């Protein structure tokens, strides 16, 4: 693996973690907002208390099971570590760079696969590489936009 490939992989990992952190953070805030808004419906003359209660319960279960806020925090921390490695990269030897990159990869979060093509495109754009990968599907583009980055 040559130095350019390592640098590309570091940038790719940084943008993947950054998008995943943003996406899961936004999902968590949206769910929290809907729970609070639905809870306020109890004080207003709303029919269908059963439906509102079921919605609140379902969203609360989603938050507990999927732990979007925790996933966001872990991914944001990894993105910061990758950014620090990007900053330190010019001063590091190839062996040192590869060693630090492998160390970071060992504790990576598990971002959704739908974000990977967008992260690949973003890393290509940032490094000035020609991107020959396929166009993003509508799902990938939507998730990338919700994740705060839709590379062209």
Regions found by a protein language model. Name each.
Residues 1-27, 69-152:
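Cytosol-facing regions at membranes
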Residues 21-73:
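Alpha-helical transmembrane segments and their immediate juxtamembrane boundary regions
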